[in-house]
Amino acid sequence: MNSKFSKIGFILAVAGSAVGLGNAWKFPTLVGQSGGSAFILLYIILTLGVGFVIFLAELSIGKISEKDPVNAYEKLAPSNKKAWSYAGFTMIGAILIVSFYTLVIGWILKYAYLSISGNLYPDLNTSSAEFGKLISSDFVSQFVCFTLIFLIVFYTVSKGVKNGIEKLNVWMMPALFILLVLMLIYAMTKDGFMMAVEFLFVPDFSKISTSNVLEALGLAFFSLSLGVGTIITYSASLPERTNFITSTLNIIFINLLIGLLMGLVVFTFIFEFGFDASKEGPGLIFVSLATLFQKLGAIGHILGAAFFISLIFAGITSAVSMIEPFAFYLINSFGMSRKKALILIGIIVYTLGILCILSSLDSTAFKIFGLSVFDLLDTLSSKIIMPLGGILAAVFVGFVIKKEALQILFGPYMKGIFFELWYIFLRFISPLAVIVVMISAFLK
């Protein structure tokens, strides 16, 4: 990398990486269906016990080495350097993710346009059919929107850490927060608001089950962008005298806060119109919410535009973070200029994105192991590469890096019993928890 983050820039960049589409279409639904604040409490505990622990492990790899993921493992390993360097190649998972993630942000861009122009769909059946048509037969819309988002993401990364990634997050993350607060203020005037508050915050411990614990465990890991080199790469540009602990806790808090704000906004309108509160994922965003924004008339067009734009912001900040690890590796290892590195990565990402579109247009084409290209990339990244990357980081820091080096690194910020607890969790509990998540994902 060619520069360092500022302290606030680092926090906002990593928070931008963590805050993504799942904050709108998965987290709120899980909270509401799984015991409200009881689930939130469970999620916070597991985030501190798993996500926080492995986050600090990846941060320590990046900070001590000041290298990209591949070279970081190789530099810090006292022996078997080449073997450990392969652990850094889990950053390929980020390239797979950004290939289909950018396409999804493109869909959201299309819906932002429909909302601004007042052309969203008036009922659930029409909304469902039109969304199905978009992803199964509308190549032009998908191609144009995907290409626009692709260009924004790569242009941002081309400017480097300070002038690209940090600048984007320094204005986009506050803008996301302001949009959500404005939508929340309007939502508070609606009858559905108190129903949303009850749905999200009234604790119901009877709903906590083994399945919910596994869901919370998965969220605790995946919501912090672990396992694909992002944290290692960003930490290589961490400014001196940064308090790692408070920075990490701030990132976790921002991620949770955005998820809850999204939830209050989303479910206020869901309950206001009596829609199905059990939907999640694309069905929640592109069908239920798109319909109710249209039903609200002129104010709905404004709210819809604000909501979809906020999702675009959340998506772009995440996508940008996924490009940087591989770019940093190519620059370090092959002496490439940032421009050449991004051209190479761009060709890969753009090709995979187009294949995702073509695969969705023809369900019989581009099938691998019975999966569309989109589903295959999702499965490889989220069920295999990300968990594996997190496990390898925990094992490497817990058993390969000397404990004394970690005590020196964290000494000013985490001492005594707190360090020892973190170290025990890092070596034994957190990796086992991620293995459980990995196995449960395959058993679904």
What positions do the PLM features span?
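Loop-to-transmembrane helix boundary motifs in multi-pass membrane proteins
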Residues: 9-10, 17, 143-144, 254-260, ...
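Membrane-interface "cap" regions at the ends of multi-pass membrane proteins
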Residues: 1-25, 54-59, 63-76, 80-88, ...
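Hydrophobic alpha-helical segments of multi-pass membrane transport proteins
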Residues: 315-322, 341-360, 375-408
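Helix-loop-helix connectors at the membrane interface of multi-pass transporters/channels
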Residues: 105-137, 237-241, 246, 250-258, ...
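A generic transmembrane alpha-helix motif of multi-pass inner-membrane proteins
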Residues: 372-397, 415-444
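Inter-helical loop and helix-membrane interface segments of multi-pass membrane transporters/permeases
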Residues: 29-34, 69-89, 102-162, 194-214, ...
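Membrane-embedded translocation segments of transport machinery
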Residues: 2-4, 166, 170-316, 340-341
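Hydrophobic, membrane-embedded alpha-helices of multi-pass small-molecule transporters
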Residues: 5, 12-22, 97-102, 137-159, ...
